[in-house]
């Protein structure tokens, strides 16, 4: 079926068949036909982010955020340079969390709420998450095609934990073949 679709596309458009994808938008794709498995990761993307934000030699952390973190909005504006740096860090972390790292989605979403009024503490926590990624850089999502696991969904919420506006945070993840296919925290 795929070959038929490719043939039709090649007849209609000028295109080349470059074979199986190994890299897509910074996400590395590794296949094993015998095991019927696919792994996706962002190891190179994370390494480049650590280099960009001068954290390549920093000590890693064991969790995305320390236990008991309570974030509040800034009362004083941050300098434009620091604000831009914070927003760049948040954007970098959001891309990783959307691509292959559901383990940081909650932490990044919480910090992104302060994208217009962060504090130095928020900035330290974005670096904390990046240090966590450093320590877990080899983490990947594995889709096990030999598994009989169907679509499974999980969800949770915290009911008004945000101290600024009392909004709840909720999260969900859906898996197929034992690998996450969709996740979100908001």
Model-derived segments and spans:
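Long, low-complexity, charge-biased intrinsically disordered regions
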Residues: 1-186
